[in-house]
From Swiss-Prot:
Annotated binding of substrate, by residue: 54, 141, 153
Residue positions binding ATP: 14, 173-174, 215-221
Protein name per the record: Glutamate 5-kinase
Main location: cytoplasm
A single cellular component GO annotation: cytosol
Pfam families in the cross-refs: AA_kinase, PUA
InterPro entries tied to this protein: AceGlu_kinase-like_sf, Asp/Glu/Uridylate_kinase, G5K_ProB, Glu/AcGlu_kinase, Glu_5kinase, Glu_5kinase/COase_Synthase, Glutamate_5-kinase_CS, PUA
Length: 369
């Protein structure tokens, strides 16, 4: 499987704040240069590189006289507005030494959850690669709200990897691999490869890194690996210090094997890029129809409605215990549905007209979770 690492023609690399900054929060020029030298080497081989980089907030701390990452959103956004310019400027200078141009792409959750925005992000990234530029992607921390944000760039990196149909995703942090437990505790050992979820049984995944300047931990990295491998993309998780060795196919870090079956891009987007705007509670018969027989969801099988959504929004379909079993694009507004619950399509068509004969969620717009 390591041969897929060296054979990858398009690579998405994600690096966290703690791997780019000094202990006081400023950008570490040596670390930035080391990363860019590695990625510049890939580009020199004719390989395409997309960099998903945290660090805007961390880079803005020192210039603003802050000694630690702020807890409140307003100060975080102020730091990001200062730090993002410093971060992209430093990258531009470093990549210029390799005769490479960078393009800044700032994304919000809304850009990924709205299908039209998602497709536009794809076109921008695709054109940058066609023009032999290096896209540098980050969450737009300056405008993201507390309620709707990625919070870390691990999930964003996995979504970008699928968006550009990459051959490899590399997650870099301050930890050299996924371990069976806390790396500082006796008895913990690194995990070389993960074939599927069964390989993680009994593994204590946790921790938020060592530096205190980032937001991601091992949990978010494993989740990002799950998302990317589910789309057929191999993932390598290792430290920034081992980036060159990892990209050279050396047996460092943890290699997550991809799923042999890739879902349709639209269903992948629905499952992983969208945020549900509501919940539809299903009776046992509807759960069986949707999950086991992959049927459309009809009003007759819904027992309750939660949330404020409009037709076309993503909603979660939950079982009698409240556990999400599927996600789909709903065909009705939330205010319409309560009067339709428990009624057959023929009854609705007779009472309200043929427009109400449609499914609540069509099977083509539904993905199991």
């Amino acid at each position: 499987m390591r041969d897929r690492v060296t054979a990858a023609r398009r690579v998405v690399v994600k690096i966290g704040s703690s791997s780019l900054t000094t202990a006081t929060g400023g950008l570490d020029d040596g670390r930035v240069d080391a990363l860019v030298d590695t990625l510049g080497g890939l580009a020199a081989q004719g390989r395409e590189v997309v960099l998903v980089s945290s660090g805007a907030i961390a880079a803005g701390l020192a210039p603003l006289g802050l000694t630690r990452r702020p807890r409140d959103l307003a100060t975080q956004q102020a730091a990001a507005s200062v730090g993002q310019g410093l971060l992209i400027g430093r990258y531009a200078a470093a990549f210029a030494r390799h005769h490479l141009t960078v393009g800044q792409v700032l994304l919000t959750v809304d850009d990924m959850t709205r299908r039209a925005h998602y497709r536009n992000a794809y076109r921008t990234l695709r054109k940058l690669l066609d023009l032999r530029a290096v896209p540098i992607v980050n969450e737009n921390d300056t405008v993201a709200t507390e309620e709707i944000r990625f919070g870390d760039n691990d999930r964003l990196a996995a979504l970008v990897a699928a968006l550009v149909d990459t051959d490899l995703l590399v997650l870099l942090s301050d930890v050299d691999a996924l371990w069976t437990g806390d790396p500082t505790r006796p008895g913990s050992t690194p995990i070389a490869e993960v074939h599927d979820a069964r390989d993680l049984s009994g593994v204590a995944i946790g921790g938020a890194g060592r530096s205190g300047v980032g937001t991601g931990g091992m949990v978010t990295k494993v989740e990002a690996a799950r998302i990317a491998t589910g789309f057929g993309i191999p993932v390598v998780l290792t430290s920034a210090d081992l980036a060159a060795e990892a990209l050279d196919g050396k047996p460092v870090g943890t290699l997550f094997h991809p799923s042999p079956r890739r879902p349709a891009a639209r269903l992948f987007w629905l499952a992983h890029a969208t945020s549900p705007r509501g919940r539809l509670h299903l009776d046992p018969g509807a759960v069986e129809a949707v999950v086991d027989r992959r049927k459309s969801l009809l009003a007759a099988g819904i027992s309750a409605v939660q949330g404020a959504f409009t037709a076309g929004d993503p909603v979660d379909l939950v079982d009698t215990e409240g556990v999400p079993v599927a996600r789909g694009l709903v065909n009705y507004d939330a205010v319409e549905l309560p009067g339709l619950l428990g009624r057959s399509t023929s009854e609705l068509a007779t009472a309200l007209g043929p427009a109400y004969e449609r499914e609540v969620v069509h099977c083509d717009d539904l993905v199991l979770l």
